[in-house]
Regions:
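Flavin-dependent oxidoreductase catalytic cores
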Residues: 1-216
Length: 216
């Protein structure tokens, strides 16, 4: 049965994030990403649609972002400063009264200097989806955060599958990077195919070692 987390449970969970980051460091990972999107726990604290708490972890912006900020602080205690710490966040719930892009930009500004990377997705909370759809539909969220911050790498995601459209997002300075999911699942050699499609010099094309001799 679901229930609102008690303060002791919140503190235990914050520590669990830190413990996981410490294990990732020992395992040799060079980056970790906190998942604050798609209706998962951190997102549930951020969104007014799910966070109806009346204590210090609910209510206004400061209360609803407190859990994430405590997680970031705890992870930073154990995660090496020379390794990447990122956050994937739903930039908007796309539902009236939900978490908004304005709040996302404000949060990113407050976390400048504490995280290296913001990865902008959207939605995941609410019974309906009222947002846009189609290739690049979430890119404006990344652009808003990029324009509102300094010193943070901002990546865009969502229905970006073609080499030209991915390159355009970066070339036009709408985001610093693009995360490709479904296209990479369909073709694990997507980076190579994209580089060839964009006429990248062959010596710069990323190539799996087993394909090197054939150059494909």
């Amino acid at each position: 049965r679901t229930h609102a987390m008690g303060v002791d449970e919140i503190r235990e969970t914050v520590q669990a994030f830190a413990d996981a980051a410490e294990r990732a460091d020992r395992a040799g990972f060079g980056a970790v990403q906190l998942h604050a999107a798609h209706g998962y726990l951190i997102h549930q604290f951020l969104s007014p649609l799910t966070n109806t708490r009346t204590d210090e972890y609910g209510g206004d912006f400061e209360g609803r972002t407190r859990f994430l900020k405590e997680v970031v602080a705890a992870v930073r205690e154990v995660w090496p400063a020379d390794k990447v710490l990122g956050i994937r966040i739903s930039g908007s719930d796309w539902v009236e009264g939900g978490w908004s892009i304005e709040e996302t930009v404000r949060l990113a500004q407050e976390l400048q200097g504490q995280v290296h990377w913001f990865d902008l997705s959207s939605a995941g909370i609410g019974d309906t989806y009222e947002g846009p759809q189609g290739p690049g539909y979430q890119v404006p969220l990344a652009t808003a955060v990029k324009e509102g911050t300094e010193g943070i790498v901002v990546s865009a995601v969502g229905s970006l599958t073609g080499a030209e459209e991915v390159a355009a997002v970066v070339d036009e300075d709408r985001a610093d990077a693009v995360c490709v999911g479904r296209a990479a699942l369909a073709n694990p050699n997507w980076p190579t195919a994209a580089a060839l499609a964009l006429d990248v010099p062959s010596e710069q094309v990323p190539m799996a070692r087993q394909y090197f001799r054939a150059k494909w």
